[in-house]
Amino acid sequence: MKKTANKVVLIGAGSVGTSFLYAAINQGIAEHYVLIDAFPQPAEGNALDLSDTLAVIPHSFTSIKAGSYEDCKDADVVVITAGRPQKPGETRLEMVAGNAEIMKNIATEVKKSGFDGITVIASNPVDVITHVYQKVTGFDPHKVIGSGTTLDSARLRRLVGQKLNVKPESVQAYVAGEHGDSSVAIWSQANIMGRPILDYVKCGCLTLEDLDQIQKDTVDMAYKIINLKRATFYGIGACLTKIVNAVLRDEKSTLMVGAQLNGEYKNKDLYTGVPAIIGSNGWERIIEWDLTKEEQEKFDKSCETLHKTIDSVKHLFE
């Protein structure tokens, strides 16, 4: 029987997961939501709390409940945010051992449920964790999406907009590679309403030092937020909503997600942040830009860093 309503299952009902759910509910992207968590009581409490919005945000959704992995079977999208949170001063890659084990267990349960939809993952270190999930499940790589550098790119756009006093929505600027310290700002592709960002350097509105500082601030933003409030969740929650909405609406939007490289950008056998077209089939195609020599070298180094981390957890899926 043909389904007439979208169903989204969230695995990991902590701050990131519930921030995603609240944003998704406000935008009305799905009809049915299910929360799964290792601690059932908070999941049930969050489901009840969010259900109270039905009276305030009409037509936003039909049902929300705490559930189990069996609920994944007929879901359109499974969103995974489960894992240990990042500590102050800790890099994302330093979280890999524990969170990779957690993801292996989740992946096993999701596959066992008979799920055949699209998976969107934000658990850190997201590039490596997405790779682990795909290897353990054996799912079509196109149907497994990492949050990639969507948040990094959003931060970059905001910082460029602040520097030039323009709305961030008018800025097209992108971060590729690892969602982490080795990420790369792709300035050669950045523009403001079609005008290349490097033109602003030529006319004196920006300096190359400004661009370097903006990239550094983009990388450091997570550490700053974690030091101030122990976790980041609103920004990534909004980014997850954008990705899931693109899947459910078959938008064919180009987003900086974690997609599996198979020779694109001269790298392969890993997930990392690249521009990809997102629709009902997952990430449908990677867009390949002509990177500068410096950008390509930095991207290669970022991929090398990820490969080394992947090697440390290969025993989980080989």
From Swiss-Prot:
UniProt-listed InterPro entries: L-lactate/malate_DH (IPR001557), L-lactate_DH (IPR011304), L-lactate_DH_AS (IPR018177), Lactate/malate_DH_C (IPR022383), Lactate/malate_DH_N (IPR001236), Lactate_DH/Glyco_Ohase_4_C (IPR015955), NAD(P)-bd_dom_sf (IPR036291)
A GO BP entry: glycolytic process
Would you say which domain of life the source belongs to?
Bacteria
The entry's NAD(+)-binding residues are V16, D37, Y69, A122, S123, N124, S147
Q: Which Pfam family, any one of them, does this sequence belong to? A: Ldh_1_C
Please name the catalytic residues of this protein: H179 (proton acceptor)
The molecular function terms in GO held by this entry are: L-lactate dehydrogenase activity
Q: Where does substrate bind?
A: Q86, R92, N124, P125, V126, D127, D152, S153, A154, R155, T232
- Phosphotyrosine: which positions carry it? Y223
Identify the stretch annotated as signal peptide in this record: none
Q: Where does it localize? A: Cytoplasm
* CDD domains, alphabetized: HicDH_like
Pathway the protein acts in: Fermentation; pyruvate fermentation to lactate; (S)-lactate from pyruvate: step 1/1
What is the protein's major site of localization? cytoplasm
Mind telling me which Gene3D superfamilies this protein's record contains?
Lactate dehydrogenase/glycoside hydrolase, family 4, C-terminal, NAD(P)-binding Rossmann-like Domain
Give the top-level enzyme category.
oxidoreductase
Its EC number(s): 1.1.1.27
The UniProt keywords, alphabetically, are: Cytoplasm, NAD, Oxidoreductase, Phosphoprotein
Write down any Gene Ontology CC term. Answer: cytoplasm
Query: Can you state which reaction this protein catalyses?
Result: (S)-lactate + NAD(+) = pyruvate + NADH + H(+)
Quaternary arrangement and interactors, per the entry? Answer: Homotetramer.
Instruction: Tell me the protein family, please.
Output: Belongs to the LDH/MDH superfamily. LDH family.
- NCBIfam families hit by this protein: L-LDH-NAD, PRK00066.1, PRK06223.1
Write out the function statement from the record.
Catalyzes the conversion of lactate to pyruvate.
Instruction: List the protein's name.
Output: L-lactate dehydrogenase
Upper lineage is:
Bacteria, Bacillati, Mycoplasmatota, Mollicutes, Mycoplasmataceae
What gene is it encoded by?
ldh
